[in-house]
Amino acid sequence: MIILKKQHDTIIVLDFGSQYNQLIARRIREFGVYSELHPHTITAEEIKAMNPKGIIFSGGPNSVYGEGALHCDEKIFDLGLPIFGICYGMQLMTQQFGGTVERANHREYGKAVLKVENESKLYANLPEEQVVWMSHGDLVTGLPEGFVVDATSESCPIAGMSNEAKNLYGVQFHPEVRHSEHGNDLIKNFVFGVCGCSEGWNMENFIEVELEKIRETVGDKKVLCALSGGVDSSVVAVLIHKAIGDQLTCIFVDHGLLRKGEAEGVMKTFSEGFHMNVIKVDAKERFMNKLKGVEDPEQKRKIIGNEFIYVFDDEASKLEGMDFLAQGTLYTDIVESGTATAQTIKSHHNVGGLPEDMQFKLIEPLNTLFKDEVRVLGSELGIPDEIVWRQPFPGPGLGIRVLGEITEEKLEIVRESDAILREEITKAGLDREIWQYFTALPGMRSVGVMGDERTYDYTVGIRAVTSIDGMTADWARIPWDVLEKISVRIVNEVKHVNRIVYDVTSKPPATIEWE
C-alpha cells in the first residue's frame, strides 16, 4: 500500500475478511481523505506510527465466538482513536468490552429498514428511517457497559450502538455498500464529524507518489508491460512510460480471444499514437491448442494466465535485461480472488494462475485503485476518452464469455454479437450510463423458426450492469426498443443464433462475468 505524505489525514481500515472491505477505503477516498487497508494482525504500535485520525473494523465471514475467530491487538483500543466497527467489527468490539454476541435464528441477507433511536454523531442529519444492506448470521444481543442502542431493524434489535465518551461506534449493516441509502453520509459523519478529517487527497497525489515509487522500484532496469488495449493495461502502460520512458517495452499478445477490430486498434493507438515500443505476438494457435477440450472456467482462466506468462517469458528471452512484468491488477481483482482472511469467490486472471517459476518480478501500480479511479487517473495522464471509457475487458478475453469449450465458431458468434451490442448502445447514447455491457454464449441451443424453416441454433446472452467500482452492480434498465434493435440485428446478422436473452441479475448474488 502506498504511504503518502503525512500532511494528508488518513483513516485505517482493518481487514477481517469481508468481501466489501476495499469498498470502505474506496468510499473514504471519494471524500478526499486517504484510506489504507491493513490486515487485522497489525499491531497498535504500527498503527500509532502511521498517525491516523481513526480506525474502521471491516466485516467478515467468521463468528467472534467460533473456532478460528479473527481478533486484533487489544492495545488498539488504548490508542484513544475513534473506532467504527462494521458487522463483524461491531461484534468484535462488543466482545472486547464485555457485551454478548449470539447466533441469529436465521441469516439476514439483503435490504432492511433501519430505525434510528439515538442521534449519535454517526447519524447526524440523517433520516430516522432508512434502507440499509444486511449480511450477517450473528447478532449483538447484549450491549457492553457504557454503550447505547443507536438504531434497530425488524430482525436486529441492536443494529447500531455507540459509546460517544470513548468515540466507539458500531453498526450491524454495511454502509459501504451502495444498497444502503445513506451509507456514504454515515461514513462521512464518522470521517469528518467524529474523526475531524480534512480533505486533501486526490489523483494528482497518487500520480506523484506512484511515479516516484515506480522509478525507485525499477531503477535503471527494464519493464515488460502486458498490454491488451483495455482501460487497465493502457493506464498502466502510460503511467509507467511517463515514469521511465524507453525502459518500458509493451508486449501485445493476440491470443485470438479479443473483440472485433481490437488487435489493429491497439497497435495504432500505442505504437503510433503514444510512440511506445510495442511488440505484437500472434499466439492464436498456441492458445487455442491449449484450450482445446477444456470446459471448466477455472481451468480456462489458469491456462490463459499461464500461457500469457509463458509467452512473455519467451519474448523476454529474446530481449536483454527485462526484470519486471507490469500488470493492470485492481483492488477488485484482489478481493474477488480472496485475501488472507476473505473467502475466495473465483481466481482472477491478474492474480491467479501464475506459474511458480515465473522469471519476472511483478509491478502492479493500480492494485490500490478501483475501476472508476483508474478512469480518473487515465484522464489525468492525458489518455483519450475513447480509451479511458473503453468497456472493461477481462484478461482471458472472450475465453470466459464462451461458456464451456472454446471453438472458433463460438468465438466468432460472441465477437460479432458483442460488436453489434456495443454499436447500438453507443447509438442510443447509453455508453457512458452503463458501466459494463457484453454478450456471452452459454452453449445452449434452442428450437426456432427462420424463413419458414426449423432451426436449432445458439442462444446469446446479453449482460449489462450499472456500477461505480465493480464491487456491487445492478442490471441496467436498457429501453425495450434498444434491446429489440440489438436482438433483431444479432439474430439476422450473426450466423447460428436464433434466440437472445437478457441477464437481469445483480451483483451480488451473481458476478458480472458469467465465468
UniProtKB/Swiss-Prot annotation:
Recorded metabolic or biological pathway in which this protein acts: Purine metabolism; GMP biosynthesis; GMP from XMP (L-Gln route): step 1/1
Catalytic activity reported: XMP + L-glutamine + ATP + H2O = GMP + L-glutamate + AMP + diphosphate + 2 H(+)
Binding locations of ATP: 228-234
Domain of life: Bacteria
Ranges where the Glutamine amidotransferase type-1 domain occurs: 10-200
One Pfam family this sequence matches: GMP_synt_C
PROSITE patterns (UniProt xref): GATASE_TYPE_1 (PS51273), GMPS_ATP_PPASE (PS51553)
CC terms in the record's Gene Ontology section: cytosol
Documented EC number(s): 6.3.5.2
Residues making up the signal peptide according to the UniProt record: none
UniProt key word ATP-binding: yes
Positions of the catalytic residues: 87 (nucleophile), 174, 176
Keywords tagged on the record: ATP-binding, Glutamine amidotransferase, GMP biosynthesis, Ligase, Nucleotide-binding, Purine biosynthesis
Molecular function (Gene Ontology), one example: GMP synthase activity
Domain GMPS ATP-PPase: 201-390
Keyword Lipoprotein: no
CDD domains xref list: GATase1_GMP_Synthase, GMP_synthase_C
Subunit structure: Homodimer.
Function as written in the Swiss-Prot or TrEMBL entry: Catalyzes the synthesis of GMP from XMP.
Protein name: GMP synthase [glutamine-hydrolyzing]
